[in-house]
Regions:
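A short small-residue
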Residues: 87-94, 198-203, 264-271
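Active-site-adjacent substrate-binding region
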Residues: 43-44, 50, 57, 65-76, ...
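Conserved beta-strand scaffold positions in the cores of enzyme catalytic domains, especially
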Residues: 11, 199, 249-251
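Zn-dependent metallopeptidase/amidohydrolase metal-coordination segment
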Residues: 163, 223-297
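Midchain, well-structured core segments that form catalytic/ion-binding scaffolds
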Residues: 2-176
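Generic non-transmembrane alpha-helical segments
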Residues: 65-75, 107-118, 187-196, 215, ...
Length: 299
């Protein structure tokens, strides 16, 4: 027999960084979906490997000649049967830390637009792709916002794919508390309609924030600071952990951003992610002390 357990009064997943994260932005994902292009110039267009990462590589195959395709920074053009292949090399990054990135999908969209290499119907859709990729804080899309608690809203285009003449460009937005997923969908849908695009496949996870003055936050924070010998402060982030699925939760360790790692150890959420034995033992001490102090609190 299956039974549904009551909500825990408090919990923490060790899925972030020390000292602790007491707030996570909302996460809105979806697609800008084009109409089915008729007699279009674009034969194929694909880029990106994940919805939550800025595309560092992209390529498109179009009906054109090499003579129509001038040289451009970060763009490589080669001849193929029936047209040309255009490849772009950008600078990737996670959706929650998009500063310094260059979106390869946007590079190709801009190249096709700047050189008039597509039909009028395709041009309309590529303009919204360009707006999405040019600015990770949503200014081009008119959705920028900042609540003073979290960093400003961010939005990126992670993947583009073409299927049966239809382009799908995904978006991944990390948004603060002074907007909502439904409000953003409304604005993006209105903008999309002007460019022949519809917003589809939407998924939304609302933001959360727990005040740093709550006793359970203080118990965890003090335990970590005492064991580490630091004066760390709570932080908020655009990433998401299991904490957002519970009524009263934070993410607590075990990553320490400034800690040097051997070359063979990958960073958080990457290949060969690892943790040093000393940090593992230190984290265990922190969690034991934090749990002991949490047990003294009357929830």
């Amino acid at each position: 027999m299956m039974r549904k357990a009551a909500w825990p009064v408090f919990l923490f997943p060790p899925d972030s960084e020390f000292p602790l994260c007491n707030g996570e932005k909302g996460c809105l994902c979806g697609n800008f979906t084009s109409v089915r292009f008729k007699d279009g110039a674009i034969l194929d267009f694909k880029g990106g490997m994940a919805h939550n990462a800025v595309a560092d590589q992209a390529c498109a195959v179009i009906r054109a000649s090499l003579e129509q395709c001038p040289k451009a920074d970060r763009i490589t053009v080669t001849g193929v049967d029936g047209g040309v292949r255009i490849e772009a090399a950008g600078i990737g990054g996670h959706a929650s830390h998009a500063e310094g990135t260059i979106n390869a999908i946007g590079l190709i969209a801009d190249y096709l637009l700047d050189n008039s290499l597509v039909t009028e119907e395709e041009e309309k859709f590529l303009k919204i792709v360009s707006l999405l990729c040019e600015d990770y804080q949503g200014h081009g899309l008119g959705i920028q916002c900042d609540d003073g608690i979290f960093p400003p809203l961010s939005i990126i285009g992670g993947m583009i794919r073409m299927e049966d003449g239809v382009l799908k460009q995904n978006f991944d937005s990390r948004y603060p508390t002074n907007t909502t997923g439904s409000d953003l969908v409304g604005k993006l849908s209105g903008l999309g309609a002007r460019y022949g695009a519809t917003v589809t496949d939407v998924e939304d996870s609302v933001p959360f924030y727990i005040g740093a003055d709550k006793p359970e936050i203080k118990a965890c924070l003090d335990a970590g600071n005492e064991i580490r010998g630091v004066d760390g402060k709570p932080f908020t982030m655009g990433g998401g952990t299991y904490a957002r699925h519970f009524k009263n939760a934070i993410s607590f360790g075990t990553e320490i951003p400034a800690e040097p790692l051997p070359d063979f150890v990958g960073k958080i959420h990457t290949f060969d992610e690892g943790i040093g034995i000393d940090r593992l033992k230190m984290s265990l001490k922190i969690y034991i002390l934090a749990l002991y102090r949490l047990m003294q609190i009357e929830f």
